[in-house]
């Protein structure tokens, strides 16, 4: 991510987080940030987010807080004897609410950080009590003003309204063709019109227009996207929607006429850098480019 908003992407490579800079020759150069951002080979960096002078780093072994001013880091982990510790160590996604609260998604619910007590309040699903969430497997989090959207692996979309503590669940209903196309949700994106785009696993791309409760489906079978597993969504400075898929490359779409992609980007394995399996897309307004995280590299 462009943590410093200077056109240089923070990226984890072999256990260390570097800044990646595009050169005038079209190459990518990496530079060290701090010795505190060197961890160990094999660590999975799942997400990063800036909050004031700190950077929160989600991994598969816990949540790290890096203070840029003091050049220090701290690890937060699950403690079975502490209900205010992280609910689980495998982090999936991070988000900041409009009132500057940090939310951390895991494979066992969501966690809201309390800076006063330096611990967490948990949002989890339980079959034995009234739960705010209907699934603990959180894939992605999207903040939209007073609403927080959670994309889950098995429960579709959960919409949380914190002030009223209300959850609205959007799930696939085989009897309702205007419901969510499938329940495993990889990514949620809100465009400038307030419409919600939802990428699912094998269910294609979903569009929920602002003010409606119905989902429009875009699928590979109808030639609307190149693959039904949608893994990343972002727009560029021309208002186009970039749709990353896991197995079909990248689709560039016009949000006002999304029935056919404007362009599909992919490369074959023999090129040495296949662009079939896309994990993340990040638009870079400084360099007017798109950073592409694929299964074979950046």
Language-model features: locations:
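Carboxylate-rich, polar loop motifs that coordinate divalent cations or form catalytic acidic clusters
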Residues: 1-298
């Amino acid at each position: 991510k462009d943590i410093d908003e200077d056109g240089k992407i923070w990226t984890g490579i072999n256990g260390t987080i570097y800044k990646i800079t595009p050169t005038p020759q079209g190459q990518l150069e990496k530079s060290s940030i701090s010795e505190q951002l060197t961890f160990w080979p094999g660590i999975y960096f799942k997400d990063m987010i800036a909050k004031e002078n700190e950077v929160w780093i989600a991994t598969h072994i816990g949540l790290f807080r890096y203070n840029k001013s003091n050049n220090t880091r701290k690890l937060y982990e699950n403690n079975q004897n502490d209900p205010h510790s992280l609910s689980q160590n495998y982090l999936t996604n991070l988000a900041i609410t409009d009132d500057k609260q940090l939310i951390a998604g895991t494979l066992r619910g969501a966690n809201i950080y309390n800076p006063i007590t330096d611990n967490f309040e948990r949002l989890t699903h339980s079959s034995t009590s009234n739960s705010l969430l209907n699934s603990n497997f959180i894939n992605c989090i999207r903040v939209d003003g007073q609403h927080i959207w959670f994309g889950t692996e098995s429960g579709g979309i959960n919409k949380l309204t914190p002030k009223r503590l209300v959850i609205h669940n959007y799930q696939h209903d085989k009897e309702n063709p205007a419901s969510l196309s499938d329940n495993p949700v990889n990514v949620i994106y809100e465009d400038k019109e307030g419409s919600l785009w939802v990428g699912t696993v094998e269910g294609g791309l979903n569009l929920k227009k602002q003010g409606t409760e119905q989902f429009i489906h875009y699928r590979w079978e109808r030639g609307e996207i190149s693959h039904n597993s949608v893994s990343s969504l972002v727009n560029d400075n021309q208002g186009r929607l970039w749709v990353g898929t896991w197995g079909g490359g990248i689709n560039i779409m016009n949000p006002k006429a999304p029935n056919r992609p404007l362009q599909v980007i992919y490369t074959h394995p023999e090129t040495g850098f296949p662009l079939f399996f896309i994990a993340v897309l990040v638009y870079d307004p400084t360099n007017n480019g798109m950073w592409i995280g694929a299964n074979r590299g950046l």
